[in-house]
């Protein structure tokens, strides 16, 4: 089951999340909305393994990239509420 990867407009274009992703889910794309003129994009969410390394690597106070685990993965990890 694929996970949902969301990129928020608080992204500063630092590339930390892209470099941290072991499955190359993320890439940088041109965007005029930040100083770096690029923003992270998640075109291959079907390859996301849910490790959340991208979240850990994000230096912004409000995480600019978030991984939302699929329900099946959440249950198997014992995280369901």
UniProtKB/Swiss-Prot annotation:
UniProt domain 4Fe-4S ferredoxin-type: residue ranges: 2-31, 39-68
GO biological process terms on file: photosynthetic electron transport in photosystem I
Record's cofactor remark: Binds 2 [4Fe-4S] clusters. Cluster 2 is most probably the spectroscopically characterized electron acceptor FA and cluster 1 is most probably FB.
Binding site for [4Fe-4S] cluster 2: 21, 48, 51, 54
Cofactor: [4Fe-4S] cluster
Keyword Transferase set for record: no
SUPFAM superfamilies registered for this protein in UniProt: 4Fe-4S ferredoxins
Protein name: Photosystem I iron-sulfur center
Taxonomic lineage: Eukaryota, Viridiplantae, Streptophyta, Chlorokybophyceae, Chlorokybales
């Amino acid at each position: 089951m694929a996970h949902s990867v969301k990129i928020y407009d608080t992204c500063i274009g630092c590339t930390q999340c892209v470099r941290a992703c072991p499955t190359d889910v993320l890439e940088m794309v041109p965007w005029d909305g930040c100083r770096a003129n690029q923003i992270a994009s998640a075109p291959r969410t079907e390859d996301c393994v849910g490790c959340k390394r991208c979240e850990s690597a994000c230096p912004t106070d409000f995480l600019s990239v978030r991984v939302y685990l699929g329900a099946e993965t959440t249950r198997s990890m014992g995280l369901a509420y």
